[in-house]
């Protein structure tokens, strides 16, 4: 999913938090940056003024403006030209410093957004870098019900009619929490972290066949809903056409594997849906098993080791 942000969107989203004022280049509000590929040579999203390797948002603090003032007229004009020519998303001046007239005029002429904030330079840098990184991070929407079970994020997937929503409802009644139903959105906010959230349209809602749309917050209380959670496990529900006949190894280890989501392989456990099986209990057990495995505890491996030791002791 391609993501982008315009200068106007960034300004509106950060105006109150950073007390931003738009002082020049208002016609450049439609300037846009898009999520780029993982390229070490691409420009930084935000940073202090850099003419050689320009940032997408150039921050001018006390030292940067003092450096501009130290240049002679010709060097100053050439430097401002270089700043403008690379077409940054915006320029941001910290500490409510006055905007130099020539810089403001160049911003207006080139339609380069220029903002002023009372925040210090490093505060602007931290806020803008974090916000841009989150906004432009790779993201994907998956079909399923995303829940918090035993404090970890679990995505329940399966074909239509496999019982995902009914399972989610049972888990809610057992004290677990809903993040998103039907279309949770996952963002890769770090090399090994997928953050799952709910689209605004579906917030607090769970659709169950026969009951329609339920408001989980109203039915179970505020604590039954979670704003976001990191994805750690996928539980996939499958409906076998015939009685499954797992191999001996699968009987020991279960039907586990992984699913590739963005750049990560997420652990996956498959649970067959059959009459008489308590899927809520099985999903809780699968989650507990995953937690144990992350701690290096594998019951199947322990049993295999015990069995091997027993055979060795009994072998003459």
Curated annotation (Swiss-Prot):
Asked if the keyword Magnesium belongs to this entry, the reply reads: yes
What EC number(s) are associated with this protein in UniProt? Answer: 2.7.11.-, 2.7.4.-
Query: What broad class of enzyme is this?
Result: transferase
Q: Which GO terms describe its molecular function?
A: ATP binding; magnesium ion binding; phosphorelay sensor kinase activity; protein serine/threonine kinase activity; protein serine/threonine/tyrosine kinase activity
Which cofactors are named for this entry? Mg(2+)
Annotated region Important for the catalytic mechanism of dephosphorylation: where? 272-277
Relate the protein's function as given in its record: Catalyzes the ATP- as well as the pyrophosphate-dependent phosphorylation of a specific serine residue in HPr, a phosphocarrier protein of the phosphoenolpyruvate-dependent sugar phosphotransferase system (PTS). HprK/P also catalyzes the pyrophosphate-producing, inorganic phosphate-dependent dephosphorylation (phosphorolysis) of seryl-phosphorylated HPr (P-Ser-HPr).
Q: Which PANTHER family does the UniProt record give?
A: HPR KINASE_PHOSPHORYLASE (PTHR30305:SF1), PROTEIN YJDM-RELATED (PTHR30305)
Protein name stated in the entry = HPr kinase/phosphorylase
Originating organism? Xanthomonas oryzae pv. oryzae (strain KACC10331 / KXO85)
This protein's gene is called: hprK
């Amino acid at each position: 999913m391609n993501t982008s942000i315009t200068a106007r969107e960034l300004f509106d989203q950060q105006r109150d938090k950073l007390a931003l004022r738009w002082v020049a280049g208002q016609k450049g509000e439609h300037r846009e940056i898009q999520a780029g590929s993982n390229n070490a040579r691409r420009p930084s999203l935000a940073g202090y003024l850099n003419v050689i390797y320009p940032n997408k948002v150039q921050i001018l603090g006390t030292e940067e403006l003092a450096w501009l003032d130290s240049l002679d007229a010709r060097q100053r004009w050439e430097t401002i030209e270089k700043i403008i020519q690379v077409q940054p998303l915006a320029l941001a001046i910290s500490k409510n410093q006055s905007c130099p007239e020539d810089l403001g005029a160049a911003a207006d002429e080139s339609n380069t957004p220029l903002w002023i904030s009372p925040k210090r330079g490093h505060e602007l840098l931290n806020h803008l870098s974090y916000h841009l990184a989150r906004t432009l991070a790779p993201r994907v929407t998956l079909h399923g019900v995303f829940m918090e079970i035993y404090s970890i994020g679990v995505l329940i997937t399966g074909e239509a009619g496999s019982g995902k929503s009914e399972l989610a409802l049972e888990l809610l009644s057992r004290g677990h929490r809903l993040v998103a139903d039907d279309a949770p959105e996952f963002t890769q906010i770090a090399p090994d972290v997928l953050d799952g959230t709910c689209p605004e349209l579906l917030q607090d809602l769970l659709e169950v066949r026969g009951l329609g749309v339920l408001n989980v917050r109203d039915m179970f209380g505020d604590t039954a809903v979670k704003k976001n959670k990191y994805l750690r496990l996928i539980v996939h529900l499958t409906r076998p056409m015939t009685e499954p006949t797992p191999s001996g190894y699968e009987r020991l280890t279960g039907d586990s594997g992984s699913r590739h989501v963005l750049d990560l392989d997420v652990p996956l456990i498959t649970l067959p849906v059959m009459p008489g099986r308590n899927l809520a209990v099985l999903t809780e057990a699968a989650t507990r098993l995953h937690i144990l495995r992350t701690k290096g505890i594998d019951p199947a491996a322990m049993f295999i080791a015990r069995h091997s030791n027993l055979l060795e002791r009994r072998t003459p």
